[in-house]
Amino acid sequence: MLRFLLATTAVVAAVPALAAPDAAVTTQLPRTVVPLHYDVSITPDAPKLKFAGHVAIRLKVLEPTTSITLNALDLTFRKARLLGVTAAPRISTDAKAQTATFRFAAPLKPGTYTLDMVYDGKIGTQAVGLFALDYTTAKGKKRALYTQFENSDARRFIPSWDEPAYKATFSVDATVPAGQMVVANLPAASKKPAGKGLINVRFPQTSVMSTYLLFFGLGDFDRIAAKVGATEVGIVTQKGKAEQGRFALDAAKAILAEYNDYFGVPFPLPKLDNIAAPGRSQFFGAMENWGAIFTFESAILLDPKIETQFSRETSFSVNAHEMAHQWFGDLVTMAWWDDLWLNEGFASWMEGRTTAKLHPEWNTALNAVQGRESAMRIDALKTTHPIIQHVETVEQASQAFDSITYQKGEAVIAMLENYVGADIWRDGVRAYMRRHAYQNTVTDDLWREIDAVSKDKPITEIAHRFTLQPGVPLIRIDTATCADGQTQVRLTQGEYTKDQPDKPALAWPVPVIARTLG
């Protein structure tokens, strides 16, 4: 470890404060109506790759309006009505905007209404919306169904306000083949026969949450589980593979206990499943649905015939990442995709921190160094972007899932924690969780909580520079000089760039931790 021969903490480069931008666009939908609760009924037809849906949305009209617009994609509406309004609305859809609009003959007054819709949807073969995965077993070919909604594909499953700031509660019931297991965000509340070899499974009302965190899974599944405090932790697999999830279950138990303590807010749901799915996707490996994490088998299960140390570490770290999201992302959610890093940077940092703490023998600190160096290489290019970047479209939101968001975000958090101290940082995170549980935030909400507890080491100005502007500071350290019993080191700052040698350097207030030797 390199230690500076200094006796104080310094900050390199006095630079003017960089203010956070004004609140970005946080919705592409009209602000006249907000959802309160979705009551969803789904009847999937897996062999035919289609499903029938019915949703009753309790909503609040905030100001007089003659229309209600929400998100919908690849859905066919059979009928719609607003309870208490005699005339049925006229329905129009906009495939490009991914919306459906319901127009009424007379203006709706402010108040609470229920919009009732019957519709049909498609089951895809790619991992968006409700999709199917086919796999082969000793008993032949099988098909299982899963959902993947982040960042904007819940609209393929339910007509909805499919944006993170529109939090609401959800009740789901599904009519499915009697021999199969249904998995959702909460444990099933009831099951009853539905005729023709079908059963209806109903799930209780969720806490308020964003649409992209809803989950539905159906298939020939096994499940193993264990209790951690008030929470049942489970691993769901295709039949015959449950024991391959034993390591992941033990990992989840240890991680959940650690997170309950670290965040200061116990996991609020009665169960936390990790659903292992066959196959893989070129776009993602796992998804943090609240109480129902989705992970491809290769990243979570351990086959004793081919298990390696790397696969064990991967299973643990993926578990740690997705479980961290249950707080950073699920309990507290960014208001819009500009602040995606609040989800991914923090989950990446918690993943590394927790893996290193619970398995120090793995020496995983090198992984953080590798991630940081990778992000720096990209951040030194002209094509880089700030950690917090303005997002206007769903396509731009999809492109924001990159190494700047993940690895640079993780590195900046590690730097700031090191600057203020681990205990102070944790206290700020706990205050943030308590204040903003079940709500949406922007990054400055976190900085305020850290500043409130760090006091003599405010971080907002430093954090703004590292999150609101792109690039990498380059710190040069001169040879130490000793005179009159004092040791001095001169530090100068520039900008590290690989393809813009003549670019005027940006400036950062860089926290420097200085220690003496001996």
Q: Residue locations for each model-derived region?
A:
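Ligand-binding face of N-terminal immunoglobulin V-set domains in extracellular IgSF glycoproteins
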Residues: 50-74
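A surface-exposed beta-strand-loop module
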Residues: 74-137, 162, 195-196
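Gram-negative bacterial Sec-dependent N-terminal signal peptides
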Residues: 1-18
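Solvent-exposed beta-hairpin/edge-strand motifs
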Residues: 65-89, 507-509, 513-517
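Beta-strand-rich interaction surfaces with strong enrichment in secreted/lumenal proteins
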Residues: 40-43, 57, 89-91, 103-107, ...
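Hydrophobic alpha-helical and helix-loop surface patches within well-folded domains
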Residues: 203, 229-494, 500-501
